């Protein structure tokens, strides 16, 4: 049951992330292929991180679901040609990003700190100039994920 649910969650998250990237491409906001890949990774980190704190499922189910989402995501990277070392690097990077975002939330900061960190990470790793408008990507992602969580809640209540 968790595997099936996690597959659905991962598909929904992937759709949100892909739609976000497509929207950025249409607005000519993606500066290079590396910029696009860094944005994908960071969007994934934000969405997975936000799911960790959601109350859409009871805590134990949420943890199992997130573990399975991670496993399926990392397996998809392997299927798409990533080496074991590259997959481990992505896993390590996700964990580092979670720690960074956790630090903002533990200080009772709002999502401005998360958005700033997001934009800074993208610019540093994509070797682009800091684009302050990228801070808003976090808000857009979280809004879309919240809508998806609302759908899950409604489906569970039915």
Residue spans for each PLM region:
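Short amphipathic alpha-helical segments and their helix-coil junctions
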Residues: 1, 5-35, 124
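Context-gated lysine
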Residues: 3, 26, 31, 36, ...
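Short runs of predominantly hydrophobic/aromatic residues within well-ordered alpha helices
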Residues: 6, 10, 36, 40-44, ...
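Extended hydrophobic/Leu-rich segments
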Residues: 13, 17-20, 24, 42-43, ...
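Long amphipathic alpha-helical segments
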Residues: 48-115
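Low-complexity intrinsically disordered segments
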Residues: 87-158
């Amino acid at each position: 049951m968790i595997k099936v649910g996690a597959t659905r969650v991962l598909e929904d998250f992937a759709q949100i992330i892909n739609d976000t990237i497509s929207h950025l491409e249409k607005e000519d906001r993606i500066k290079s292929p590396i910029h696009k890949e860094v944005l994908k990774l960071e969007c994934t980190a934000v969405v997975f991180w936000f799911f960790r704190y959601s109350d859409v499922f009871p805590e134990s189910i949420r943890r199992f679901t997130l573990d399975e989402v991670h496993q399926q995501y990392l397996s998809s990277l392997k299927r798409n040609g990533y080496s074991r070392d590259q997959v481990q690097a992505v896993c390590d990077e996700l964990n580092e990003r979670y720690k960074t975002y956790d630090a903002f939330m533990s200080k009772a900061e709002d999502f401005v700190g998360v958005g700033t960190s997001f934009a800074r990470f993208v610019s540093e790793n994509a070797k682009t100039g800091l684009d302050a408008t990228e801070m808003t990507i976090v808000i857009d992602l979280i809004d879309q994920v919240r809508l998806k969580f609302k759908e899950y809640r409604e489906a569970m209540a039915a």
